A protein has these predicted regions:
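A generic structural signal for secondary-structure junctions
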Residues: 32, 118-122, 142
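Hydrophobic-ligand-binding modules of eukaryotic lipid transfer/binding families
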Residues: 1-9, 131, 135, 143
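Beta-strand/loop substructures that line and gate deep hydrophobic ligand-binding cavities in soluble
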Residues: 79-132
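Glycine-rich portal/gate segments that line the openings of hydrophobic small-molecule binding cavities
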Residues: 38-87, 96-100, 132-143
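Hydrophobic ligand-binding cavity/cleft-lining segments
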Residues: 1-45
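Solvent-exposed residues in well-ordered beta-strands and their adjoining turns
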Residues: 9-13, 53-57, 68-70, 93-95, ...
Length: 143
C-alpha cells in the first residue's frame, strides 16, 4: 500500500474550504483524474456515498466511496473500492486567518492493467495529482 500526504495553506476560512471540498459535485473541478461523480447518496453522518469515475494512465474505472468519518470543518475520511482501494483523509486546520488543508491518501491499485505500471511511476503520478488537487482548491478558494 502506498501513502501520500500533502498540505497547502489557503487564504480562505476553514468553513468555506471544507464546504467546497466536501461537496461531491465539486470534485471533478479540483481532482484531475476524476471525470464524473454519480450515484451520490447523503449519509446520516453528514458525509456521502458516491461513485467516482476516474481516468488514470488512459484507463477508465469506477470507484465506490463511502464517508466513514465526518467532522464538520475539521476532518473527513472516505473508504473507497474499485480500480483502487484507498483511504482518503482530508484535514482542515485554521492557519493565520486562513486554512491549512491536508490530503492523506493510502491506496492499493487493484486493476491489473494499472498494476503493471512501475510502482514508482504510480506513486509519483499520485503525488503530482495530490499537489494539483490542493493547488486547484487553493486557486478556487482564493479567486
Amino acid at each position: 500500500m502506498a501513502k501520500i500526504e500533502k498540505s497547502i495553506i489557503i487564504d480562505a476560512p476553514v468553513e468555506d474550504v471544507f464546504n467546497y471540498v466536501e461537496d461531491p459535485g465539486n470534485i471533478p473541478e479540483y481532482w484531475p483524474s476524476v471525470i464524473e461523480i454519480k450515484d451520490v447518496e447523503d449519509l446520516p453522518n453528514g458525509g456521502a456515498r458516491m461513485t467516482s469515475v476516474y481516468k488514470m494512465a488512459g484507463v477508465r474505472f469506477d470507484v465506490e466511496s463511502v464517508c466513514t468519518e465526518y467532522v464538520p470543518n475539521q476532518r473527513t475520511v472516505y473508504e473507497s473500492e474499485g480500480g483502487v482501494s484507498s483511504t482518503a483523509t482530508w484535514i482542515y486546520e485554521p492557519h493565520d486567518g486562513g486554512t491549512k488543508a491536508t490530503i492523506r491518501n493510502e491506496y492499493t491499485v487493484e486493476l491489473p492493467v494499472l498494476r503493471k505500471l512501475a510502482e514508482s511511476f504510480l506513486v509519483k503520478m499520485n503525488e503530482n495529482e495530490a499537489d494539483a488537487i490542493l493547488a486547484n482548491v487553493k486557486a478556487k478558494m482564493e479567486a
